[in-house]
């Protein structure tokens, strides 16, 4: 993975990070254990539904959805169609998270990234044609809204196809690849690179979180589903 100047990113793993990775490996992967008599699989669907709803609402609220949690939960549980922009963001996120469960065994491709973005942003963008389409200009910047300061100018839009192809290859590597990258770090870097490249006019945060979820699930971190 490289920055917009072609320089390779460097990864540092200080001791606190290694400890955190150990805890995640211990508690979020492997066999499901429970101290209760009732097998966890009997409650799995209920827990999973609740988790998907919570993730969909929280992720959308981070992006500005103003729908209340109570209204959003009712919409998803009742299966009714969204009535406004905020509800549409939550509905799209929920539908995409459901789809990701079946896609975790699939390799990541630029086409899949575009499709995930399309699903997440359908009917929520100022220009509906931008859903599932790479940005075509360089007027997208990361800005401090308090002062209007440009914090980050993403790579040139003409570089995005190649950068997504490179990112997909990185995402598909496994524990036998060289150099070894811990699966959790790989998922974090996927999230980071979408934010760094900002390949879309909007919805980059939602897409980054979806790819993080996909990567963690693909690597066997079952707790991420809950």
Short names for language-model regions:
Residues 1-226:
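FIC/Doc superfamily catalytic core
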């Amino acid at each position: 993975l490289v920055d917009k100047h072609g320089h390779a990113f460097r990864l540092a793993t200080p001791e606190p990070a290694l400890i955190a990775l150990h805890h995640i490996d211990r508690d979020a992967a492997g066999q499901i254990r429970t101290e209760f008599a009732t097998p966890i699989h009997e409650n799995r669907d209920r827990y999973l539904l609740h988790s998907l709803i919570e993730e969909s609402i929280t992720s959308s609220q981070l992006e500005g959805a103003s729908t209340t949690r109570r209204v959003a939960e009712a919409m998803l549980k009742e299966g009714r169609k969204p009535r406004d922009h905020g509800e549409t963001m939550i509905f799209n996120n929920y539908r995409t998270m459901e789809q990701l469960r079946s896609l975790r065994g699939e390799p990541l491709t630029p086409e899949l990234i575009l499709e995930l973005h399309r699903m997440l942003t359908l009917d929520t963008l100022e220009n509906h044609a931008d859903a599932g389409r790479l940005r075509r200009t360089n007027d997208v910047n990361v800005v401090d809204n308090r002062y209007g300061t440009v914090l980050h100018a993403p790579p040139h839009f003409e570089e995005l196809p190649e950068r997504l192809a490179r990112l997909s290859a990185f995402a598909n590597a496994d524990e036998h690849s060289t150099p070894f990258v811990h699966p959790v770090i790989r998922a974090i870097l996927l999230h980071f690179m979408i934010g760094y490249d900002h390949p879309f006019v909007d919805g980059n945060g939602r897409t980054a979180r979806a790819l993080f979820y996909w990567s963690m699930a693909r690597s066997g971190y079952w707790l991420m589903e809950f």
